[in-house]
């Protein structure tokens, strides 16, 4: 899947969250990244439209500012999307990756903010609907500055899953993705060091066994519900 990820952040180099996401995507996915602050300095609308039309999946990535996306994203949409016809983007996928400074529990019914992140950013769902695009559930990252290394590793895999698939983030789909990506990475490692082959193969076998056990457990739970 050809994914183009548009970053709307005024200083990506000084943002630990954006740097982590960018490095993860560049190193472990085929996604193309576009910095909107750089693009808008010398905007060529035809080139931007060509890039959109060539993509299968379009991702907007940004920090939440006052319950919305940064203004530059809307400025870019206004200039680049306004002359496009819905038929030109029909069937493509639109997704949103948003970094939120507040706690997750604040953004829900009864929480401090009283609205979910999806509700606050519902304008992007309307945009996708207008252009007859498929809209993915929002990928929200809360309080990145407080998560530990293990949580960051989990975040990286979830982020790659979001970038590279249109599947629902169910446990079985997610685990299959990790196994497939791990096999790719492992084959690259083995190509440079054949001594690693037995260790990597054992790792893959363990993942596949866990996948089987999870699928079996989910099947039992489903039968119980029925």
Please state what every model-predicted region is.
Residues 83-104, 201-226:
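Ser/Thr/Gly-rich flexible loops in soluble cytosolic domains mediating phosphotransfer, phosphorylation
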Residues 118-138:
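A charged, well-structured terminal subsegment
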Residues 28-42:
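A short beta-strand-loop structural module common to alpha/beta enzyme folds
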Residues 47-124:
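Helix-loop-strand module that forms the ligand-binding subsite of alpha/beta enzymes
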Residues 1-31:
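N-terminal beta1-alpha1 ligand-phosphate binding loop
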Residues 22-26, 133-223:
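Glycine-rich phosphate/pyrophosphate-binding loop and the adjoining helix
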Residues 8, 36, 99:
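Cofactor-binding loop segments of dinucleotide-utilizing enzymes, especially the Rossmann-like FAD-
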Residues 40-49, 148-150:
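Structural motif
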């Amino acid at each position: 899947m050809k994914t183009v990820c548009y970053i709307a952040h005024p200083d990506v180099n000084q943002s630990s969250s954006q740097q982590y996401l960018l490095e993860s995507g560049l190193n472990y996915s085929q996604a193309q990244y576009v910095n909107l602050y750089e693009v808008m300095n010398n905007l060529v609308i035809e080139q931007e439209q060509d890039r959109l039309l060539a993509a299968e999946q379009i991702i907007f990535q940004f920090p939440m500012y006052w319950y919305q996306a940064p203004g530059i994203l809307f400025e870019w949409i206004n200039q680049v999307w306004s002359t496009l016809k819905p038929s030109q983007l029909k069937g493509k996928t639109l997704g949103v990756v948003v970094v939120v400074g507040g706690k997750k529990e604040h953004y829900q019914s009864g929480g401090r903010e009283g609205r979910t992140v999806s509700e606050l950013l519902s304008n992007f769902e309307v945009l996708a609907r207008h252009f007859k695009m498929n809209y993915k559930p929002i990928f929200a990252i809360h309080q990145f500055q407080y998560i530990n290394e293990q949580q960051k590793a989990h975040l990286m895999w979830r982020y790659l899953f979001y970038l590279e698939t249109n599947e629902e983030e169910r446990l079985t789909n997610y685990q299959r993705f990790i196994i497939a990506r791990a096999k790719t990475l492992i084959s690259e490692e083995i190509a440079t060091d054949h001594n690693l082959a037995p260790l990597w193969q054992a790792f893959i076998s363990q993942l596949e066994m866990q996948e089987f056990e999870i699928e079996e457990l989910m099947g039992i739970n489903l039968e119980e519900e029925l």
